[in-house]
Amino acid sequence: MDFREILLIASKGQGVNHVPKRYSLAVGPPKKDPKVKGVQSAAVQAFLRRKEEELRQKALEEKKRKEELVKKRIELKHDKKARAMAKRTKDNFHGYDGIPVEEKTKKKQLVESHLNQGTDQEYDVEEEDFIDYNQAELDQDYEEEQEPPKAESKPKAPLKSAPSPMNFTDLLRLAEKKQFEPVEIKVVKKAEDRPLTAEELREREFLERKHRKKKPEPDAKLPPPVLKKAPSHKDIMGTKPSRGAGDRQLASKGLPFPQAEKKFRPSTASEKQAALSSPKSLPGERTKVGSGSSTQPSLREGHNRPVFNGAGKPRPSTCSPSVPKTPASGTQKSASEHKAKKPLPSHPSHSKPGPTVLSHNKSKSPGVRQPGSNSGSAPGQPNPGTARPTLSSGPVPRRQNGSSSSGPEQSAGGIRKLASNSHLSGRTLNGTNGPGRPASSSSGPGRPISGSAGSGRPVGSSGGPGQPVNNPHDLRRPMNSLSSPGRAVSGPGRSISGSIPAGRTVNSGPGRPVSSLGPGRAVSNPGLPTKPRCTVVSETISSKNIISRSSNGQINGMKPLLSGYRSAQGPQRLPFPTGYKRPREYEEDDDDEYDSEMDDFIEDEGEPQEEISKHIREIFGYDRKKYKDESDYALRYMESSWKEQQKEEAKSLRLGMQEDLEEMRREEEELKRRKAKKLKRH
């Protein structure tokens, strides 16, 4: 085909085939990924990428920080070691005798100390609580040590493998579903961190104690802190043998009778009669009162029995030369002693080493005397129960256990007076006999010691020859009647019955000198039976005063006075505590100073309680009704944390500032008003 023909063909078809080009209106295939309604996939992907990046970054930072810390730690360890070695000077100290000293842990020391403690030791309540507390700590530590192995022993649950990552399209679908669902935020309940109230504290304490008691504590056997409750009224009035037995045990153990002062000495007329008749035996030991009206049983109850001091050792009694036998001899029992025994069930005074009571005194309640402290507590012997040495260790052979034969009192022909024996200045009152109790009667404040208990006759040994028993009313003075007010110490050897309750003469007659034979014995008048006077000692006397007094013991080392004399001098008196000053009354000064700022102070004297409450409610928003059920105990011991207190402080500070601002604003307004008034006037 030649070129010319081709051109012709082309020119022919040129107009026919020529169609102008236009943009296509047809919808092409979508260029983007199919969209899921409402979720922008690109945004989600970007978010995920960002998260991954952040996590990677955090992990890197953590790693770096750990490395730095490890480096520092290693340095610190080296430094510490170096410092410790530099400080230590006795690194190689192996004890003075070459045996290395074994350092015991605190826990071991505590346990050992428990084991070493004897059962007969006396503990204060505080000490016992402390040991309980330590024991509880030990138990806790022990439990904590035992718990970790339990935790390890549990088989570990196999770790759940992480779920396989979701496909991206599935993730988008899930997002579409979840996007309108509300997100549940779990509120972590905070344990209420409020301070406990007193009741809750008490309850918790009680439960802890209960829990502690359940665990046996074989190593620490402590004596119960309180040996005996105060006797009930029945116990006081009726003398019961069972009580006596308890006291006997106490005495033998050497424990002091804690309630000694609170027990009273009941006495019955019949007992007095028996006591008085007992002197028939052993004439040598019997002493007649000057008046001869009544003789006193020379035999003390424990006369022929060995007297034990609280610790259980027989205490030798220094019998006077006139009496051939010591109480420990136990050989001669006379009819009088049998008689003396009759009242015994009422109180085992014989078990007490120091019943210096005449046999008619037997009716005293057992607890009255602490072991070894005769009412005149044996001079020169430590009262074992009280653990205080009785001070007047005077040379006079006085009866050391009040229970020794009457003879001791007649020592040296009865010349020596038991004046010092009668509790010089209240020394060696029964151990607990505090300053507030009459010295001579350990039984209770102001009760005469005499066997008749309330009858107002002095017990022989305690009363001293003709010494009046302490003024029963004179609760606060432990001295002999000498020091007790209102009583004249009349003449040598005379006891004036002046303040003795029933108005009775202490000796056979108020004015009569006791014959020198029976120096220590005031003869009780048998014919005057009256009810024992019971006075309760409400206060516990502090041991400080007792000790200070006891140092005075034998009236500053004077020899015991002869029967003719009675020392009414100071040492027998309890020194007045110097630290004590009477509160002065300042009421007179109240009106002197006038404070202008106090004008707006709310004085609620005249107003009823509701008015006051109203004021308080207005000022503080305080409602008394909310707190009316709170006991004083609860309010006093309510627990409060530092945080709570800070809140309260902040609150009160805020209120205070607001009030100050208001005050200032009011003052400014007041000033403005005054200025305005002045301007108006002018």
Swiss-Prot record:
Compositionally biased residues, Basic residues: 673-682
Residue numbers spanned by region Important for interaction with DNA: 1-569
Protein name: Protein SPT2 homolog
Primary site of residence: nucleus
GO biological process, one term: nucleosome assembly
Top-level taxon: Eukaryota
Function: Histone chaperone that stabilizes pre-existing histone tetramers and regulates replication-independent histone exchange on chromatin. Required for normal chromatin refolding in the coding region of transcribed genes, and for the suppression of spurious transcription. Binds DNA and histones and promotes nucleosome assembly (in vitro). Facilitates formation of tetrameric histone complexes containing histone H3 and H4. Modulates RNA polymerase 1-mediated transcription. Binds DNA, with a preference for branched DNA species, such as Y-form DNA and Holliday junction DNA.
Region annotation (Important for interaction with histones) ranges: 570-682
Covalent cross-link site, Glycyl lysine isopeptide (Lys-Gly) (interchain with G-Cter in SUMO2): 37, 186
Residue numbers bearing the Phosphoserine modification: 277, 596
Low complexity composition-biased segments: 156-165, 435-460, 490-504
Domain notes: The acidic C-terminal domain mediates interaction with histone H3/H4 complexes.
Pfam family, one: SPT2
